[in-house]
């Protein structure tokens, strides 16, 4: 086992440690719509629930390599709406490909032939094949880190989901380190203890 002081490591090593040790992480496959009406779809794994009353979640979005805003950040800041689509094994490859650096005027969903459907409340559509989609209104945003990450707090205002997810999350995808993912295929139920 190794022990290290974070302050003595280069940034790249710190990132590698965090990405590989805090795993698996749930994946938020976020759909947004630009002011021009272009649907953006991109995956983020710095994501989780915060509270249930009200139902709040957070997602942290980095910058492009040139330091400019990613489409997801820009769209959420401009419109105040986004949809978190959960990812099943069947959607894994397309989800991964949607993380490439597409220009703002290009819809990842259209490029990857992903079928979308209208949301119940917010303007961004949901990925039709997603087993669950959480429609969110932006409640708060702030920046953290020396290379500032946009942290968005969204209130879940509508949900569309497959009923089986209330008793089993088998088949859902999580993010590991690097370009590796995991799929839930084993659940341990301790309710009898």
Regions found by a protein language model. Name each.
Residues 1-193:
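Basic, polyanion-binding surface patches
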């Amino acid at each position: 086992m190794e022990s290290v002081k974070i302050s003595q490591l280069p940034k790249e090593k710190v990132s590698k440690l965090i990405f590989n040790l805090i795993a698996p992480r749930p994946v938020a496959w976020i759909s947004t719509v630009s002011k021009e009406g272009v649907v953006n779809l991109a995956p983020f794994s710095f994501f989780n629930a915060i509270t249930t009353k009200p139902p709040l979640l957070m997602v942290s979005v980095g910058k492009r390599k040139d330091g400019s805003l990613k489409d997801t950040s820009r769209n959420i800041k401009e419109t105040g709406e986004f949809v978190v689509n959960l990812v099943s094994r069947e959607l894994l490859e397309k989800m991964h490909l949607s993380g490439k650096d597409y220009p703002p005027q290009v819809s990842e969903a259209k490029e990857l032939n992903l079928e979308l459907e209208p949301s119940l409340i917010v303007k961004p559509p949901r990925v039709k094949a997603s087993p669950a989609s959480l429609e969110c209104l932006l409640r708060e945003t702030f920046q953290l880190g020396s290379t500032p990450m946009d942290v968005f707090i969204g209130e879940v205002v509508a949900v569309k989901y497959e009923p089986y997810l209330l008793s089993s999350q088998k088949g859902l995808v999580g993010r590991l380190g690097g370009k590796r993912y995991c799929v839930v295929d084993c659940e341990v139920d301790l309710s009898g203890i």
